[in-house]
């Protein structure tokens, strides 16, 4: 699964002051695999229009947290509150294309949703994501960076309020990473989006995030990039950052 359409009003929606002006409010969240605790008492909020990056080591709970937020994992302990009537688009870290099934990029996008779910057509998002030139190519032949753009376009067809991306630039070169982050900033303005990303790219994170949350099972520190780089817990977790 590489996206998820969620109408959170059907799961949990609150009107009280605790979620006023916030799209997601997480309180005292914990999660266990069997008897092993992998998320430990995490709390944070996401405001409308923010770019939030979640940093942490491998095995620190980033992907588990993301899967809770998008509704894949439900047997958690704690509270996750959502604003009413909003849609989440989700891109996981890994997505594979079956090379034995011929499918052009254009066909893939057009066949992605029923008319009921689709809020925008392929033509509405092509120019914004800059994939017009690869519509006739096979999905199995495009590069990783191009695949991420196609999946992002597919996500935007839902006209989501929030997009969640798990390590979206992990296999891109420096130029591609820079272009992708610039695109995300542009899309926030065009589509009035909020964004949550996980990442290991500290330097790109610091220049492309409104807020950074560092986790290793629990939240170690949280704040703006300028605040985070001075935080002793951040410096201890990422001792190689300079």
Swiss-Prot record:
Residues engaged in binding ATP: 56-63
- Tell me how this protein sits in the membrane: Peripheral membrane protein
Q: Where in the cell is the protein located?
A: Cell inner membrane
UniProt keyword Transferase, yes or no = no
GO MF, one term, reads: ABC-type zinc transporter activity
The chemistry this enzyme catalyses reads:
Zn(2+)(out) + ATP(in) + H2O(in) = Zn(2+)(in) + ADP(in) + phosphate(in) + H(+)(in)
Keyword annotations for this protein, in alphabetical order, are:
ATP-binding, Cell inner membrane, Cell membrane, Ion transport, Membrane, Nucleotide-binding, Translocase, Transport, Zinc, Zinc transport
The ABC transporter domain, residue ranges? 24-241
Q: What are the GO cellular component annotations?
A: plasma membrane
The main enzyme category here is translocase
Instruction: Quote the EC number.
Output: 7.2.2.20
Task of the protein: Part of the ABC transporter complex ZnuABC involved in zinc import. Responsible for energy coupling to the transport system.
- Subunit (UniProt): The complex is composed of two ATP-binding proteins (ZnuC), two transmembrane proteins (ZnuB) and a solute-binding protein (ZnuA).
Family statement: Belongs to the ABC transporter superfamily. Zinc importer (TC 3.A.1.15.5) family.
The molecule here is called Zinc import ATP-binding protein ZnuC
């Amino acid at each position: 699964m590489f996206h998820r359409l969620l109408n959170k009003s059907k799961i949990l929606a609150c009107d009280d002051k605790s979620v006023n002006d916030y799209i997601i409010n997480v309180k005292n969240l914990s999660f266990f695999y069997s008897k092993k605790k992998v998320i430990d008492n995490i709390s944070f909020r996401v405001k409308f229009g923010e770019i939030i990056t979640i940093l942490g080591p491998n095995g620190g709970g980033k992907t588990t947290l993301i899967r809770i937020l998008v509704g894949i994992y439900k047997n958690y302990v704690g509270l996750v509150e959502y604003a009413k009537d909003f849609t989440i688009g989700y891109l996981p870290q890994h997505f594979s294309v079956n090379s034995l099934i011929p499918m052009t990029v254009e066909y893939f996008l057009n066949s992605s949703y029923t008319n009921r779910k689709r809020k925008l057509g392929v033509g509405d998002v092509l120019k914004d994501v800059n994939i017009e030139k690869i519509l006739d190519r096979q999905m199995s032949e495009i590069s990783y960076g191009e695949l991420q753009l196609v999946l992002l376009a597919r996500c935007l067809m839902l006209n989501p309020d929030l997009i969640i991306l798990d390590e979206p630039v992990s296999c891109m070169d420096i130029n591609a990473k820079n272009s992708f982050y610039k695109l995300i900033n542009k899309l926030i303005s065009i589509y009035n989006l909020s964004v949550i990303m996980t990442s290991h790219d500290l330097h790109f994170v610091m220049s492309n995030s409104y807020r950074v949350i560092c986790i290793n099972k629990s939240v170690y520190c949280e704040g703006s990039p300028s605040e985070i780089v001075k935080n002793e817990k951040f410096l201890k977790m990422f001792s190689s950052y300079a």
